[in-house]
Every structure is written in structure tokens, then in C-alpha cells.
Amino acid sequence: MKIILANPRGFCAGVDRAISIVELALEIHGAPIYVRHEVVHNRFVVNGLRERGAIFVEELSEVPDGAIVIFSAHGVSQAVRQEAKDRNLKVFDATCPLVTKVHMQVARASRKGTKAILIGHKGHPEVEGTMGQYSNEDGGIFLIEKVEDIARLPMQENDNLTFMTQTTLSLDDTAETIAALKEKYPAIQGPHKNDICYATTNRQEAVRELAKLSDLVLVVGSKNSSNSNRLAELASRMGVKSQLLDEPADIQADWFNDVKTIGITAGASAPEELGQSIISRLKRFGANSIEELQGLEGNMFFEVPKELRIKEVN
């Protein structure tokens, strides 16, 4: 069997920054460091940070007063920020800057009293944080996941409306939903460019090319990773078998029946070393050659907070 690697795959700049913030906080301040929610949605990464002294919690009520807490890459609501301030918690914010950009759009709509529509997945921490930027009772923010949800929106055609999206959605599904929104609300405003981030976009485009060449597409990523799930769904939509896997032990022999070419990609929160360990396991199942596709090389970089830059600390 032949292995073809998608390009780009794996860590994006926002994930890289978030992990670095936890690592640097541990290095400078020592354990324990509290992290609200999994800093990124990857079990391998989270377990590694936990072993080094990070304590992952879901609510700030689990964090002692005055302790250091890190907000995950997915962002948090204004209410969570205020709670941290009220309790004198030392906060390092690992929110991806591209998520912060969406937060600013929502906050702007809230200040103006413009009703906002967020396209995203209910219950996802990024969505909860984004919804929590809106506080104006004279307006409102409404969540939709798919085209069918639009019919249930309470707004009128001539209402002052704006929309924004979660950063890790399917490009195809989101384009369809935005088109339907604009059809129902012709005057609705939105970002000049959709909010789906560069890493999500590039990785989905890479999977399109990968699926054309593969009998099976393996996506390295955790089940709670939105962008990883979208990659697996896209491959399936293109008529190729796909599997989402968290670690080498997830691999099953019957996946490879009638498979000559295996395509491999990785979600934006999956480290390269995990991908390499999966490739090593695939060799035991008969994979004997590896090819990497050409693709858009990521050159985006997001700086960590000033207080965590080692040279400036020293």
C-alpha cells in the first residue's frame, strides 16, 4: 500500500500559540497552572500538558482564588472574563486571534443593537464564547447550524441584521447557509471575507486533492475536534472511505480491504509526531511507500503574551 500525505496538515498558528502559552506558563511560574477547557481539542496534546502540571477544568469555580488560569484557544464569554477579574485570577489568554476577530464583530453588533446570527455548532466552546460577547437586550444573537434552521429565526426581512461564523466549519455547508440567509434577508451584513480561518480552509482544500488520489483517507484528530471532523466528512462526501483516529491503536485491519492508496491528513490541533507514529503503525499493515503532496505552506505566526516571552521575562 502507498501512503499520500496531505499538505498542509496538523498544527495551525493558533494551536501552536495556545500550546506555547501553557508550556511557557509552566516554565516561568511552575505547576500547577489551571486551564479552562482543553486548551486545544487533542487528547495527545492535553495528556502531555497534564503530565507537566497543567490542570484542566471546565469552570472557573474549580480554580482557587488568585491562581493562574489560561483561557483555551476557543475563547470565552465576557461573563467568564468578568468572573476571573472579580476573583483576582491571573489570566493568560490563549484565545486564537482569529476567534478574537469574530468576538469583536459580535461585540460591535451588540454595542449598536444590531441583531446577530452566528453560524456554528451548538455546545462547541468556541460558539459559547462567541455568543457570550453579545449583551445588548435590545438586540440579540441567534445560533443556526444549517439552512433548515433559518426558517425558525424570529427576525423580519427589514430588521438590521449581521452574521458571523464559527472558524472551523465546512466551507461548502457554510457557503450554502450564508446564501440562504442572504436570500431570506437581502440586507443582512456580514464580514467581507467569511470567518472560517485560513487553516481550516487550506486543510479542507488539501483533503479535496487527497481524496481524488486515495482509496481511504485517515484524519488524525480527536473526536471533539470540529475541524478534524469536517475533514473526515469532506472526504466521505467526495466518495472516499474515511476514518477519524486519535492514536495508532485505533487502526483496524479491516479498514484496508481493497485499499491500495491511503491518504493521511491531520486536524489543526494534531501534532506531527502523532501523525508519524500512525504512519509507523501503518507500515505493519503493509504500507511501503510515502509521498507528500504539494500545498500551501503556512507562514502565519501569532505571538504569545508579552509576560510569557522568555527573553523579556529574563
From Swiss-Prot:
Disulfide bond positions: none
Residues that hold dimethylallyl diphosphate according to the record: H41, H74, H124, S225, S226, N227, S269
Catalytic reactions on record: isopentenyl diphosphate + 2 oxidized [2Fe-2S]-[ferredoxin] + H2O = (2E)-4-hydroxy-3-methylbut-2-enyl diphosphate + 2 reduced [2Fe-2S]-[ferredoxin] + 2 H(+); dimethylallyl diphosphate + 2 oxidized [2Fe-2S]-[ferredoxin] + H2O = (2E)-4-hydroxy-3-methylbut-2-enyl diphosphate + 2 reduced [2Fe-2S]-[ferredoxin] + 2 H(+)
MF terms (GO), sorted A to Z: 4 iron, 4 sulfur cluster binding; 4-hydroxy-3-methylbut-2-enyl diphosphate reductase activity; metal ion binding
GO cellular component terms attached to this protein's record: cytosol
Protein task: Catalyzes the conversion of 1-hydroxy-2-methyl-2-(E)-butenyl 4-diphosphate (HMBPP) into a mixture of isopentenyl diphosphate (IPP) and dimethylallyl diphosphate (DMAPP). Acts in the terminal step of the DOXP/MEP pathway for isoprenoid precursor biosynthesis.
Protein name: 4-hydroxy-3-methylbut-2-enyl diphosphate reductase
Annotated (2E)-4-hydroxy-3-methylbut-2-enyl diphosphate binding sites: H41, H74, H124, T167, S225, S226, N227, S269
Species: Haemophilus influenzae (strain ATCC 51907 / DSM 11121 / KW20 / Rd)
Any one GO biological process: dimethylallyl diphosphate biosynthetic process
